[in-house]
Amino acid sequence: MELAKGNAEIQVGIADYKVAASPNRLITLGLGSCVGVVLYDPVKKVGGLLHIMLPDSTQFNNVTKPAKFADTGIPLMIDEIKRLGGIPSRLTAKLAGGAQMFSGLDEKFVLNIGQRNSKMVKEILSRMGIRILAEELGGNRGRTMIFDIASGQVTIRTIGSPLKVI
């Protein structure tokens, strides 16, 4: 994880996260069944964007990328936001992704990863006392998530749909 400085648009890869302060923007592409989690301290104007792939790390023996999972990635990102001066009790969340990318398949073959990711993210945020201000979850289309730290706005670009600000 690297700390972003200045006025930049910083890419967040799959199974990764970035934290930054205003006036930076964080962007992640390819949110299908993955979930993008934005955490923001509106007073300090610092925040982060996490791109999780799976809900739970406990099913794996050797977790080398904790940002891949909701249960390990969210606490990790909160720790980094605290290093920038963010206060956990002030954090708010915005979520996107969690799509069912393989619609039309026989139900018994579908793992519902998107739905499970969304559910786990919400459970973890609730346990940590972090309020979800907005979400753009589900459906069957990929999304791009752009987080403007200066304003706290998150713009969602969904294939075949107009831009949506949450």
From Swiss-Prot:
Annotated Pfam families: CheD
Broad class of enzyme this protein falls into: hydrolase
Keyword set, alphabetical order: Chemotaxis, Hydrolase
Domain of life (superkingdom): Bacteria
Entry EC no(s): 3.5.1.44
CDD domains (UniProt xref): CheD (cd16352)
Keyword Hydrolase set for record: yes
Family as reported in the entry's similarity comment: Belongs to the CheD family.
Role played: Probably deamidates glutamine residues to glutamate on methyl-accepting chemotaxis receptors (MCPs), playing an important role in chemotaxis.
Protein name: Probable chemoreceptor glutamine deamidase CheD
Lineage of producing organism: Bacteria, Bacillati, Bacillota, Clostridia, Eubacteriales
Gene transcribed to yield this protein: cheD
